[in-house]
Amino acid sequence: METANGNAGSAATAQNGQQEDASGFKLKFCTVCASNQNRSMEGHLRLAQANYPVISFGTGSLVRLPGPTITQPNVYKFNETSYDSIYRELEAKDPRLYRANGLLNMLGRNRVIKWGPERWQDWQVGMPRVKHEKDQGSIGMEAGVPDIVITCEERCWDAVVDDLLNRGSPLNRPVHVINIDIKDNHQDASIGGGAMVDLADSLNRAAMEERDKVGAAVFDAGGAASRASFDERVPEVLGEWQERWPGLPSTWTLSWF
């Protein structure tokens, strides 16, 4: 069941979730869970608040949220249904139930992050995200090409890796796909969001060091040769992170856009 803590960010945060940041280079991230509702959106929010460019997706065939019984889920289409419309529908159906199980809090948070749930398999990598300028984390993601994809469970990782293989690497650009096994509930999603930011900070430090060595223009081009030294460091960085977060098993692979 997907729930969330309803944290919509501080009042000091800009509409797109990012404050003015003087710390320099930032890797670009993508977070992925099944329905683009709980874990990926918690990660999306936390990374945006940490001034990382970020987008998020789900890998399921449909958006599924808990209903009045286990056999009566609330089902919606990706890319066509806004978080606000889902919020209003559930509030009209049974406000007590959906407030008690955390769905209204979750959707209230989500609708200030971006318009609605997006499906990974429908996403055109590298397509400019000109209609997403109000999304939190949108600054720096205008070109629509992340450096790191973080999934929240193994089946989502499998879906992302398989989809990238099927796409045939048209951009010939490396992307690190990392799975963090996060249980789909309120508390673990919050913990997982903090863990994502910790990992992002560690990866970004390594990237900045390697970028300084090869030059900003070369590194930022995103080619395999220009980022080889950073790519080689990712497993070590992830291993050090795993020691700090032993309760969140991780998996990694280098894939291609």
Curated annotation (Swiss-Prot):
UniProt KW Hydrolase keyword: yes
Biological process according to GO: intracellular phosphate ion homeostasis; mRNA 3'-end processing; positive regulation of telomere maintenance via semi-conservative replication; regulation of pericentric heterochromatin formation; regulation of siRNA-independent facultative heterochromatin formation; sno(s)RNA transcription; termination of RNA polymerase II transcription, exosome-dependent; termination of RNA polymerase II transcription, poly(A)-coupled
Keyword terms: Hydrolase, mRNA processing, Nucleus, Protein phosphatase
Major enzyme class: hydrolase
Principal location class: nucleus
Annotated Pfam families: Ssu72
Source taxon at top rank: Eukaryota
GO cellular component: chromatin; mRNA cleavage and polyadenylation specificity factor complex
InterPro entries reported for this sequence: RNA_pol_II_suA
Enzyme Commission code: 3.1.3.16
GO molecular function list: protein tyrosine phosphatase activity; RNA polymerase II CTD heptapeptide repeat S5 phosphatase activity
Subcellular location per the Swiss-Prot or TrEMBL entry: Nucleus
Catalysed reactions listed for this entry: O-phospho-L-seryl-[protein] + H2O = L-seryl-[protein] + phosphate; O-phospho-L-threonyl-[protein] + H2O = L-threonyl-[protein] + phosphate
Function: Component of the cleavage and polyadenylation factor (CPF) complex, which plays a key role in polyadenylation-dependent pre-mRNA 3'-end formation and cooperates with cleavage factors including the CFIA complex and NAB4/CFIB. SSU72 is required for 3'-end formation of snoRNAs.
Protein family: Belongs to the SSU72 phosphatase family.
Record note on quaternary structure: Component of the cleavage and polyadenylation factor (CPF) complex.
Stated name of the protein: RNA polymerase II subunit A C-terminal domain phosphatase SSU72
Species assigned in the record: Chaetomium globosum (strain ATCC 6205 / CBS 148.51 / DSM 1962 / NBRC 6347 / NRRL 1970)
